[in-house]
């Protein structure tokens, strides 16, 4: 059987948990569990932002201690700051590339962030992935 911390993490890992998932999370979070272990697991699995958002949305962040709340909140807002910076950089890059009439395709994180997560604090990105046809590569490198 899974640990209570794992079950909480699983219940809180949906981007938009439905009513049934919310009720399950409420039931689990009201039980006794290792708060430090829960937060460590969330950080390790890359879902600290989701855990923070969903516990806050349900109004149950108070079940965690002050240090755990601060840690989750810090991860969420750090991811948001980093992602906003990357989005700003991407906008500048695409404006320059667009002036050169070069077509690029966004890959991996940025499209997921915008189309799936719809919240810049849920998943920290570390880079911008672009796909460029080989014949356009010299033009992109010059810009």
Model-derived regions, located:
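Active-site nucleotide-donor binding segment shared across nucleotidyl transfer reactions
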Residues: 91-142
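Helical scaffold of the NTase/Pol beta-like nucleotidyltransferase catalytic core
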Residues: 2-6, 17-108
């Amino acid at each position: 059987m899974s640990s209570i911390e794992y079950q909480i993490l699983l219940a809180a890992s949906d981007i938009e948990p439905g009513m049934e998932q919310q009720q399950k999370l409420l039931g689990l979070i009201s039980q006794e569990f290792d708060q430090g272990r829960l937060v460590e697991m969330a950080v390790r699995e890359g879902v600290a932002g989701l855990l923070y958002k969903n516990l806050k949305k349900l109004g149950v962040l108070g079940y965690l201690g002050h240090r755990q709340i601060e840690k989750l909140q810090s991860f969420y807002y750090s991811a948001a700051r980093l992602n906003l910076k990357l989005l700003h950089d991407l906008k500048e890059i695409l404006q320059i590339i667009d002036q050169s009439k070069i077509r690029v395709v966004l890959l991996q994180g940025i499209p997921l962030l915008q189309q799936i997560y719809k919240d810049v604090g849920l998943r920290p990105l570390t880079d911008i992935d672009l796909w460029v046809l080989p014949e356009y590569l010299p033009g992109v490198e010059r810009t």
